[in-house]
Amino acid sequence: MLSNDIKISIIMPVYNVAEYLPKAIDSVLNQSHKNIELFLVDDGSTDSSGMICDEYASKNLCVNVIHQKNSGAHNARNNALKLASGEYVCFFDSDDYVDSNMIKDMLELAIKYNSDLVISGFYINTYYNSNDYITLNYIPYTTNDSTVENFNNKNDFRMNSYLNFDRNMFYPPWNKMYRLSYLKERNITFPITYRDDFPFVLSVIKDIENVTYTKNQYYHFLRKRSDSETQKFVENLYEKREEEHIEMLSLFSYWGLQNDKNSIEMISRRYIDRVIECIVNLFNKECKLSSNEKESMIYKYLNNDNFNKCIKNANPKKLYLKIIYSILKTKNVYLCYIMAKFINFVKKKNIKLFSVLKTNR
């Protein structure tokens, strides 16, 4: 079958993104692969986003619009997923954009290797104002640094997956092309959760057998960061990270890798990095906890069973993280308190440096 004969479904939840929406839609309509259906799901927008969706639908037969009461991106994606009729499906965000060959190139790989999932590299453009931004590159690991690598054996995929967890390939849904029948046969949908994307992707890869990676980058994730946004306090962050850690342990145990040295090291390091994030979160300007309450929270984080196990198994790669880990190992609440205040100081004074350090860890 020629690739042009294969329909691709693209699902895009939309909520109050009128400023960015036309560029996102145009990047889909300008794909070199033309056999597409685009679902724009207006999630109860209060700006002109819904009208923009309708305008595009009136001019393009491939555009389908769903208007729904505000109920979250997970609901928007799931409602469109019920209607999708393509052989493969992609999930894009409505304030990002994609390169014109993304669908064509990834579909050609899906056909060549009969893949259930194709995963590509991507860009994150972090904007500090309309003209000031940095671009960070995210590229999957492949054996021998090849541009493309296919796994048609689930055990090989699982054994190598720790390398691409490290490269952030599994967290977002939008750098991927999924075989639609694979999702529907397994009733895989986006769960109602505080983090729509990660549990969905974990469900996809749990039993997958045929996966293809490409180092080519197509997706541009736009991160808009004002000073106030970088200082936002995240409620219940620690509880969320604990739940994520349990899900990671569960997945690798299901895969039979609960004792695999490389996988355990990655999971442990990932957990400790997120404990650092939780400690730093206590020291932004929106946190209303007293000094004593913050110290109590730090003590709680450092005396958790998961922390005790992970700090022994984690092997940080960067010098600055080795220093931070050595402070954590002391379990000295006061030292960790000072450390977190310093990290927040760097974050406030040089958000670009902080963003780069956080990414390259």
Give residue spans per PLM region.
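Short aromatic/hydrophobic "clamp" motif used to bind/position activated sugar donors
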Residues: V89
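Membrane-interface aromatic/basic loop that binds lipid-linked glycans or pyrophosphate carriers
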Residues: F283-R361
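Donor-binding/catalytic cores of nucleotide-activated saccharide
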Residues: S94-T214, Y219-N236
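Catalytic core of nucleotide-sugar-dependent glycosyltransferases
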Residues: N216-R225, Q231-N259, E277-F307
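Short alpha-helix within the catalytic core of nucleotide-sugar-dependent glycosyltransferases
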Residues: P22-D26, G50-D54, G86, D99-I111, ...
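Glycine-rich, basic loop-to-helix element that forms the pyrophosphate-binding segment
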Residues: Q68-A84
